[in-house]
């Protein structure tokens, strides 16, 4: 195995051979180390992943709104079904190890007694974005309140009920703080979204 370590999104490979495992996107740089004959290490910068956790596979249609948006932005992601109530050990283990496993933000989807986002946030200091899912007797209001009303010290960013796309965009904006290429993609998306609205404006009178 090629020796390497990862720190803050950078894989440092201590070898002169470019045959390490690749992550996408990759940027390689050669650095001279020492004063004698040149030796090299390779720095491989890779985009952090977005973790997506749903409490039940019934939330999948809302999750797909998020994954579709992440695909548009070329952001890698990983999806799991972990319940805060039925599989608390697995949910906790995912959260505890998320940073070391290359995640930069976590989306948590749950309905009704929606404790998933809070349970994840309690076990990581990565940004956690809660997505309350519509369902139950009050059409998702219970999930919204369960997700947003977090105690001081354990924050959860919460989007609208069924707001999977906005959750993905918020995660992208968080990652873009340290990723200029992703920030550019987000800027371009804003411009394209505005063009779509203006095209509709230009043709609205013809529809009356």
Give each language-model segment a name.
Residues 58, 141-207:
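C-terminal binding/interaction regions
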Residues 82-99:
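N-terminal beta-loop-helix "entrance" segment that forms/cooperates
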Residues 50-86:
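Glycine-rich phosphate/diphosphate-binding loop of Rossmann-like nucleotide-binding domains
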Residues 94-132:
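Glycine-rich phosphate-binding loop
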Residues 67, 92-95, 122, 139-151:
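Active-site-proximal loop->helix
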Residues 32-46:
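Short, Lys/Arg-enriched N-terminal segments with co-localized hydrophobic residues
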């Amino acid at each position: 195995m090629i020796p390497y370590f990862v720190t803050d999104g950078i894989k440092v490979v201590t070898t002169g051979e470019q045959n390490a495992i690749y992550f996408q996107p990759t940027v390689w740089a050669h650095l001279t180390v020492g004063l004698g004959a040149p030796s090299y290490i390779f720095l491989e910068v890779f985009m952090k992943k977005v973790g997506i956790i749903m409490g039940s596979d019934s939330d999948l249609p809302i999750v797909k709104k998020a994954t579709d948006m992440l695909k548009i932005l070329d952001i890698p992601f990983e999806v799991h079904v972990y319940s805060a109530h039925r599989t608390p050990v697995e949910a906790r283990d995912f959260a505890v190890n998320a940073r070391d496993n290359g995640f930069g933000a976590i989306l948590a989807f749950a309905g009704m007694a929606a404790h998933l986002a809070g349970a994840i946030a309690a076990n990581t200091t990565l940004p956690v974005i809660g997505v309350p899912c519509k369902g139950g007797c009050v059409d998702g209001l219970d999930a919204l309140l369960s997700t947003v009303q977090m105690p001081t010290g354990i924050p959860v960013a919460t989007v609208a009920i069924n707001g999977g796309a906005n959750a993905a965009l918020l995660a992208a904006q968080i990652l873009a703080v340290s990723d200029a290429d992703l920030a550019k993609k987000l800027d371009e998306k804003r411009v394209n979204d505005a063009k779509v609205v203006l095209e509709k404006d230009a043709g609205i009178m013809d529809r009356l």
